[in-house]
Amino acid sequence: MEKRISGHTGLLALIGSPVGHSGSPAMYNYSFEKLGLDYAYVAFDIKEDKVKDAIAAMKTFNMRGCNVTMPDKVEAAKYMDELSPAAQIIGAINTIVNDNGKLTGHITDGEGFVHNLKDHGIDIKGKKITVAGGGGAATAIQVQCALDGAREITIFNKNDAFFERTLQTAEKIKKAVPECVENAYDLSLIHISE
């Protein structure tokens, strides 16, 4: 069935650079068609220095929202009217929701992870959590676990480009959720004996 776009069609997008390889437009547009939703999803190649303009255009065109990918996640967070609790701690976003001109930035990786655990009968409240890695998704998972009541989070990461960020994330969580014990360890310092 051919997609008909009208003056009532809601617009959603992906912003970042590069985005030409993204499968998101095909995935979302297929889903909208199957669900009978009057939306269209496109990808805009937006370099970091144009994020402010892109977000202003989002309001101007009354776009319902967008996904944000690298390298725009930190820059986009600066122009939100509101940030979710996890996005406040991390200082980056991957989703923008436009609610009548009010833009709220979210970081959804951790929310999705914790929601999936709950769907499988696992409640993290009061639990000890171990996370391997300190990249973007791992950071979001650590933060969301702390926000959702994990008692202790231990992060293991090799001393690479993400390690300093791993230590910073641990400190941010300690400040935002002081009841959660946060530990970060350099994997290169851990020796396993046989």
Outline where the language-model segments fall:
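Glycine-rich adenosine-cofactor-binding loop
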Residues: 16, 107, 126-146, 157
